[in-house]
Amino acid sequence: MLHSGMVLAAPQSGSGKTTITCALLAAMKNRKLAVRAFKSGPDYIDPMFHRQVIGVPSRNLDTFFSGADQIRELYGYDRESFSYSVIEGAMGLYDGLGGTQKEGSAYHLAQTLDLPVVLVLDARGMGRTMVALLAGILQYDRDHRIIGVILNRTSEGFCRTMTPVIEKELGLCLLYTSPSPR
């Protein structure tokens, strides 16, 4: 691993990756951690939110436009000034160029940088189907790199009920829950 960091990814756009990324960046900054942010792909809007939260520029890393060596060089640039990096994925975890190729996906970026993935799942309106969805994602590629899940738009009670199920049936750690807006 080049540097301590993680990729926040999701099954699809609209899952709350940007909100969760900004909340995580703010929490790390509040704990006086020297954190920096990246966005996978060419998106320029989300990096502006990252910068607003942490006060330092957020950079783009795109495995379609840049080769593996250049990606590692860009990620490693100025790393001694930071203790941790958070990379926000784009679209779904495996959605690269045109939504059909691995190149350009958050997964490909995590592979290239040898980083773990934390999956953000919008669990609103789901019960056990959420476990089936996660199981499918985990089985799709055995090198999924997923170490944990953040459930977005759900309740504390639901998470208390589902945490043992997720941990026992999937071997995943439930890292955080984000409540539904009222």
Named regions from a protein language model:
Residues 2-15, 19, 25-113, 121-148, ...:
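ATP-dependent carboxylate-amine ligase catalytic core
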Residues 40, 154, 181:
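Hydrophobic pocket-lining residues within nucleotide cofactor-binding pockets
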Residues 75-76, 164-165, 178:
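Short, surface-exposed amphipathic charged segments that create phosphate/polyanion-binding patches used
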Residues 117-120, 175:
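Short hydrophobic alpha-helical runs that function as membrane-insertion/retention elements
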Residues 147, 173-176:
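Residue-level detection of beta-strand scaffold positions
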Residues 153-170:
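GTPase G-domain guanine-specificity segment
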Residues 176-182:
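Conserved small/polar residues in nucleotide/adenosyl-binding loops
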